[in-house]
Every structure is written in structure tokens, then in C-alpha cells.
């Protein structure tokens, strides 16, 4: 094998994929993180769970002030609403608006198409090997 560097190559591919995804999101008028939050709220709501700011802070490992800023922008874009909870006035449940739900559906369809294009480059066996390698790298980085 030639003088290839795993970390450098992973970093380059990651940057290129991130740029392509960022372009996809920007053409839809949202950021990658806003889409991730729309996705989280959609999945949680479908599972019958309420979503609060603290859930987002923990799930995405980001600071409360950052989450608050992102949510404020999403409220301005009418993608979400924060509503008070009856039994605790301090808590504000985060819900998708109709616009937010439509935006999620539209962007999610484009993300699925993007992922399917990538998957089409590989055989089923190559995809299995790829995920095995990713799992090992993920486990290694958790040590």
C-alpha cells in the first residue's frame, strides 16, 4: 500500500462530504445543526417523547447558550415553537410547526437521495466492511 495516511484521508473525505451537505442544507435555507434538531424533534415526537432544550444540549453535546441561539433562529424562521408545560412553568417544550415539519420532510428526502448516491458506489460487502471499520474507529475514539 502506498504512503497513505488514514487520518488525513478521513479528514479530507469528511470535509468534502460536509461541504456537499452544507450546500444541500443552505439551498434549503437551513444549517446542518438546524436539520439535526428538526430530525431529533421528529424522531422523539414519533416515539411519543417531549423535547426540551436540555435534551438537545445532551444529545448534541453543545452548550446551553448555543442551543438557545439555534432555537431562537429556528423560531424566527417559524420552524419550531416553544410552549410552556402545565406542571412546570420553567420548562418549555419544543414542537415542530407545520413549516418545520414540511422543511424536515423536504430536506430529509434530499439527504436520503444523497446517501443513496454514496451507497451506490459500493457493494453490500464493501458497505459491511466500511461499517465494521467505522465501528472500530468509533470504539477507539471512545477510549
Task: Tell me what each language-model feature is.
Residues 1, 48, 125-143:
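C-terminal regulatory/oligomerization modules of transcriptional regulators
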Residues 1-28:
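N-terminal leader segment of winged-helix/HTH proteins
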Residues 23, 73, 136:
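Alpha-helical DNA-recognition elements
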Amino acid at each position: 500500500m502506498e504512503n497513505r495516511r488514514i487520518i488525513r484521508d478521513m479528514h479530507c473525505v469528511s470535509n468534502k462530504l460536509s461541504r456537499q451537505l452544507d450546500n444541500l442544507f443552505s439551498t434549503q435555507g437551513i444549517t446542518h445543526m438546524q436539520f439535526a434538531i428538526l430530525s431529533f424533534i421528529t424522531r422523539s415526537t414519533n416515539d411519543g417523547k417531549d423535547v426540551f432544550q436540555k435534551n438537545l444540549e445532551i444529545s448534541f453535546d453543545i452548550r446551553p447558550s448555543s442551543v438557545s441561539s439555534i432555537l431562537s433562529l429556528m423560531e424566527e424562521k417559524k420552524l419550531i415553537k416553544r410552549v410552556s408545560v402545565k406542571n412546570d412553568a420553567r420548562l418549555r417544550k419544543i414542537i415542530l410547526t407545520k413549516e418545520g415539519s414540511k422543511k424536515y420532510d423536504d430536506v430529509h428526502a434530499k439527504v436520503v437521495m444523497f446517501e443513496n448516491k454514496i451507497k451506490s458506489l459500493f457493494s453490500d460487502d464493501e458497505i459491511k466492511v466500511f461499517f465494521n471499520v467505522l465501528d472500530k474507529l468509533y470504539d477507539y475514539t471512545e477510549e
